[in-house]
Structure formats: structure tokens, C-alpha cells
Amino acid sequence: MAQKMLEDQDMLDQLLSGVHDSDLDFSESEEEEEEEESSSESESDEDSDMEVEPARQEAGPPEQCQQQPQQRAREQQPPPQQQQPQQREQGPPQQQQQQRTPKRGEESGDARPRARAPSGDAGPGPSGQARLPQQQQPQQPQQPPPKPPRQEVTVRAPGDRQQPQSQAAQPIPVIGGGCAPFQLRAPIAAAAATGWGGEQAPAQPLFQHVSPLNRRGDEDRRSGRDRRRREGRERDRESRSKGRNWYRPYPRGSSGARREGGGRDAGQGQGTRNPGPSQGGCEAGPSQAQAAQAARAPRQEQGERRQMLPQGQNLGPRPQQCPPQQCPPQPCPPFPLEALPILRAKFEPSCAVSYTNLVKSIQKIAMPPFLMRRREASPPCHFSKIPQATPGLVIPAAARTGEAKFEKFTDAFVQKVIDRGMSPQDCINKTVSLRKLDAKFDPLKTFTAKTVNFGQWLDVRKDSIINSGMSTQVVFLEELCAWAKLNLQHGCNLEERDLILHTAETVCSQLMYKLKPIMSCLEPNKPYASMAKQMAYLVCGAGRIQDAGMLLREVKVGSPLTMLVAFSLCVPVMITCRNRNPSLFNYCKSFLDMYQPGLLCALFNTMTSKLNTTCTEEECYASVRAAIGSVVNTRGLLFVPGI
């Protein structure tokens, strides 16, 4: 039994001699040590296969065997003040706990096999005891895995957004694995913008949106740029003076003059130099040359400072050192183009002119987006607006002659003119000499201006003018020119209410409309034909009668077609521009001064009697005959001036 106790003592000595000082860490409380020792003893008693139980029973209780190693460990343990720095040097507490647990199992006699045993360990020997190595190598503390770097977040102000330092792209996972091509990049520092003096401004983070339709992320930059342009344009509209040429973004001068003080932001006197004291300017104000010299001096100083800096460093934006009155104006951004609706038609080189005209037309009419066909399959119209079909049923406009009121005049001539005017008689029966019309002008003027059936007469006259050929329109034009000439001779205003003068624009536009498709057949001279076509476009297509009169004043008429067009234009132009353009009024009056009864009928007959020899097709003759008309409708015509 004594020999058994000596063997146990040797075993404990070898165990304590092989343990490294760093493994003996008893910094925990004594209560935890007692609990761990009791648990290890219970496990060793139940699981151990070695015959240690008889030796313990002979030697006494097991606490006596464990008192000696505990006393030695306590002697080697440093005080609590020295234990804390030693624990920090040894490593994290998790590693220490892992190192203490197997050693205490060996102290308690636990000889269970382990997954990874040292090279010197072996299984139980023939005596039933575990063979231990002569000296156990100290275990090196395991290094913990490196933790990912924390993303530092800097909050400058309560309203600032938190921007992580990581600039890597953050792909969006999709179903099935992989990443979608649609990614949202982290804030990317924009390139340093060039300042006013050439210095580099601080970079600003921009959010770029990358998608298959926006691969380079230009949409976000473009939207911000357009917004800044709109704000600048509104600001310029408020501050810009409404002087001469105020609508120009910069003066007509050279770019050098614009750099020295011209431009949209230059204030009053855009594009002009500041007047000196001798020119009536402010004596205290600096000249333009002084302002430019003052602006160049800081730039030179800024360049010298930039040369002194090491490579890769830029200067910040230079603060404004001069008053706003002396500093040159900032360059204004160009005007943004107006947004156009998406056109379904595609640009083709062969139809470039047509495409350009299409764009101009859409810009002119300001077509709203909901009226544009965005797709090829879009319907051509709103089918809900189409009513039910009524084949063969057309409702004509009935004449208002039945609503006319009875009126009686004491003058027999006026009564005779009224009776003939309502009936579709021949032109010869309605012919009245110009001298008799001049003699009976006052009672006839009273009827044309104060008749109670004014609306009914206009209805009948316009119906005959619009629904008839050129022969009927030329007869109404004869009546119009003769009556306008008599009004001017008697000092009447052409703008007053008058039954005959009120239809002047209708006669002019309808005659131009009938002449336009056959002008090439009626006029062999191309310059005269082109002039007549342009006047017809201004009157019929655009309704610009005054512009057509101004064009007439700039050219010289010399053919039956152009003279007929000039006589049809003179009366409507005189009615509209008497107070607006007196010179044009006097020019058109010269046509009425040389008017004679029957002159327009003679021009018309000369023009239609001999057609252009180049037109030999039957379709051309058919168009001319249809425009001239086969019947002269004189319903509503009061008189035909004669000699």
C-alpha cells in the first residue's frame, strides 16, 4: 500500500512538472473551482476504467490526494493585482478555459481517449494506469479569426445621410442564384469640378443608377443638370432687364467682349463696356480693364501656390475676394432644348426634310402627349366618338329667306335693287351704271348699313360666293371694288357695318382658293405664278391678309393673274390696316383709283381664254372648267357696276 501511494505521488509530480505556468490560471473564484473539481471527480469515478478506487480507500479520502497539488498551485499563483496584466498577455479567456479543462481532467485521473492526443500519450498499461509523457509541450494559444472591418459612419449634421466608407458595388441577389444586371451602386465620389479660377472644387458624392437602359449612370446627372438649368433660367428671367435685345443670351460681339463683361448676367447694357467718366459714367466705378486685371491677379497667385504643392494635391475653391460689382460674371449654362414628344416616325436620310417639317409642325401646334400615337398598334382614332351610320341621309342647310321681315323704302331705286338682289337673275339685268350708283349712294348706304334683315342677306350672299365658281366670285368682286371706291369718295369708313363690305374677306379667300390649284395652268411665267401661290398661301392657309398685302407692295404685278389677285386683296387689306399701317392703306387705295367697271371681268376672260400650252392632259382642262364654273349664281348680288 505504501508503494502504491509512492507511485501516485510520483505520478502527480510528473503531472505538475509537465504543466506550463501559463496553463495554471486560477483567476476564477474559489466557489467555481470547487464546483468544477467536484464535477470532474464525479465523472472520473464513473467513467474511469483504472483500479484507483482501492488505493484511495486505503490512503484515506480523495481530498487528501488533491490537497497537495492545490497547495502548490496556490503558491505559484500570483496575487490578484499581478494576475490581471498576466491574464491580458496570455490571451482571451475562451482559450484559457479550453486549456484548463483537459489539464484538470488529468489531475482528477480522467484517462478517457481524446480525438487528438499528443504524440507521447498512450493507452492504459498492463498495471491499469495511464502512461504519461515525460514532459508535455506547452500549447500555443490559437489566434482568433480576423473580424471584418467595421464600417465607420460619420454624421456631420442631424439632417445628413450616413454614407459608409465601402465603395464596392452591392449586387441584388435573384431567384436561381447569381446577381441581376440591375445594380445600385454605393455613393461614388464625383470628379472634382473646375472652379472659376481653374482650381479644383471639392468632390461631392453622387448616386449613380446603373441599369440596362442606363449603363453609364448618366440619367441622374442629366436630371440634376436640367434642374439646375431650369433654376438658372428662371433666375435670369427675374433679374434680366427688358431692354433692347433682352431676349439674346449674349451680345452679337466677339467672344472676347463677352468674357470681359458681356453675357446674360451682365445686367443693364448687355454686351457693352462700362462708360468712363468722360462718357457720363460713374467716376467711382472701376473700368472693365481694371476689373479684368483684378481678376487675373488672383489667378496668377493661385497658379504659383499650386506649383508649390506636392503632386496629387489640389487647392480648394478660392473665396470671392472682390465685391460683386467688380467681379466678372459667371458663365451661364446653355439654354436647354424644349422636351419634344416621342415621335413614332423614324428619321430616314431620304425623308430628312419631311421629318424636320414634322417636328416643326408638332412644336408649333403644341400637341399634348395624350394625343400622340406612341405605338404602331395604337388605334387611329377614338371609336367611341363615331356615331351610327346613316347611309344616303344628308341634312342640307336651309336658307333663311323665309325668316326675312318685310321692309318698305320710299326710294323706288333702292326698292328695285332689293327686289332684284333676292332673285337669281342674269348679270345683265342687275347692271347699274357707276354714275347712278354715285347719285343714289346715300339711300343705298342706309339700306346696306341699317337693314333689319342684315343676317339673312349675309347668309344668302355667302352661300352664293362659297358654293359657286370663279365666274360668280369675279362678279361679286366687281360689286365690292365699285362700292368701296364710292365709300372712299363720299368719306365713309370702310370698317363700319356694311352689307357689301362685310363679305370682302370671304370673296378674297374663296377666289384665292379656286385659283391656287390651277395657277400653273393659267400663268406661264413662273415668277408670277410663284408670287400668286405665296399670296394664296398667306390668305387661305394662314389667314394673314395683312402680310399678303405687304408682299403685294414689295412686288410689281404684270400679268392678268397677279392683277386679279391684287384687286381681290386691296379691299380686305384696307379694311384691316387703315389705322395700323397707313402706308399700306394708301398703296392699296391706288388699285381702287384705277378701277373701272368691267376691268376685273376682262382680266378674268383674258386669263381663262388661253391656257398654258404645256398642259395637254384632259385632267388639267377638267380642273380649270370646274374652277371657273358653268353657271353664274347672282342670288344675293345687289348690282353689277357698269359704264
UniProtKB/Swiss-Prot annotation:
- Bias type Basic and acidic residues, positions: 103-113, 215-241, 298-307
The record's listing under InterPro entries reads:
ICP27-like
Arranged from A to Z, the UniProt key words for this protein are: Early protein, Phosphoprotein, Transcription, Transcription regulation
Q: Name one GO biological process term.
A: regulation of DNA-templated transcription
Region: Disordered, residue numbers: 1-180, 194-329
Q: Which residue stretches does the UniProt record annotate as biased composition, category Acidic residues?
A: 24-52
Name the chain's protein. Immediate-early phosphoprotein 57
What organism is the protein native to? Equine herpesvirus 2 (strain 86/87)
